[in-house]
Structure formats: structure tokens, C-alpha cells
A protein has these predicted regions:
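Short, aromatic-enriched amphipathic alpha-helices that serve as compact interaction elements
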Residues: 4-22, 30
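A solvent-exposed, acidic/Ser-Thr-rich amphipathic alpha-helical stretch
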Residues: 7, 25-77
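A beta-strand edge to alpha-helix "cap/lid" segment located at domain peripheries
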Residues: 1-5, 21, 56-144
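Hydrophobic pocket/interface hotspot
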Residues: 13-16, 27-28, 35, 47, ...
Length: 144
């Protein structure tokens, strides 16, 4: 285990969340040119520009998103950093807050080549605001 390498990669993932939440193009500098991106309902994208292709799916509906930086859990393992956490935001006028509403919990798997991200797989329910009522088979009166 190389703790300095792990610390550097965790720092890069923290920077990813900060830049992504701000919608800053500099987020692309954290990725390899041929990076692989996966997001539910988007599928796979290849090349770092595919990150913005994925984000375009939220054009006109995502008012803001903020990851809860102080509650992120980082798990370094070899070339990977797994991050579990919550986010909050507003989509089409409706808010969500991970841990308080059905949407907003996520797990991201970052793969690194050197100090740059070569792969990002995002695992979450993209129904952030809980509008997919027919599939709430266990009811909405749950602890989130």
C-alpha cells in the first residue's frame, strides 16, 4: 500500500466533486484523454469529453447539485478509489437531499492511471426527486 499515492488520488477525487459541482471545464484536466465514463441511463461514454455529453442529459432541468463533501467516504484500493456519499440539489423545481429523501445516495468508482482518472463509473438512482412512484414497491414511508 502506497499511502502517498492513495492520498494524492483521494485529493484528485475530492477535486473532481468540487469542480463538477461548479460546472467547471477544468474537471476534464483530471481525466485521461481516453477515459471511460459510466452513468445509469446514459450508459458508457469514451473520451473525457463524454463527461459533458452525460451532463447534457440534465440540461434545462438540473438547477444545482452539491455533494456533501464532509460526509464522503473514500476507499483506496490499488488503482481504484471508491467514494460513497450523498448529494443534494434541485431538479425541475423539486429538491432532494441524500439521507433525507429517496434520491441522493451514490457510489462512484474511480480508476487511475498515474494521477489521472482513466475510468469513472457512477452508481445511483437517477430518479433524484422520487417521481417514479410505481416502483416504490416498499412504500415511500422509509428511512433514507
Amino acid at each position: 500500500m502506497d499511502s502517498s499515492r492513495d492520498d494524492k488520488r483521494i485529493q484528485v477525487t475530492r477535486e473532481y466533486f468540487r469542480l463538477a459541482d461548479q460546472g467547471r471545464r477544468e474537471v476534464l484536466d483530471l481525466f485521461h484523454d481516453e477515459a471511460e465514463i459510466y452513468f445509469p441511463k446514459f450508459g458508457f461514454g469514451f473520451g473525457r469529453q463524454s463527461l459533458f455529453e452525460m451532463v447534457k442529459g440534465f440540461d434545462g432541468v438540473l438547477e444545482f447539485i452539491r455533494h456533501d463533501y464532509d460526509k464522503l467516504t473514500f476507499i483506496p484500493a490499488g488503482d481504484y478509489v471508491v467514494v460513497e456519499g450523498t448529494s443534494r440539489g434541485r431538479l425541475s423545481g423539486k429538491t432532494w437531499a441524500g439521507g433525507e429523501t429517496p434520491g441522493g445516495r451514490f457510489c462512484n468508482v474511480f480508476k487511475f492511471h498515474g494521477d489521472r482518472i482513466s475510468s469513472l463509473h457512477v452508481y445511483l438512482d437517477p430518479d433524484y426527486t422520487g417521481e417514479d412512484i410505481p416502483r416504490f414497491r416498499w412504500g415511500a414511508d422509509r428511512k433514507w
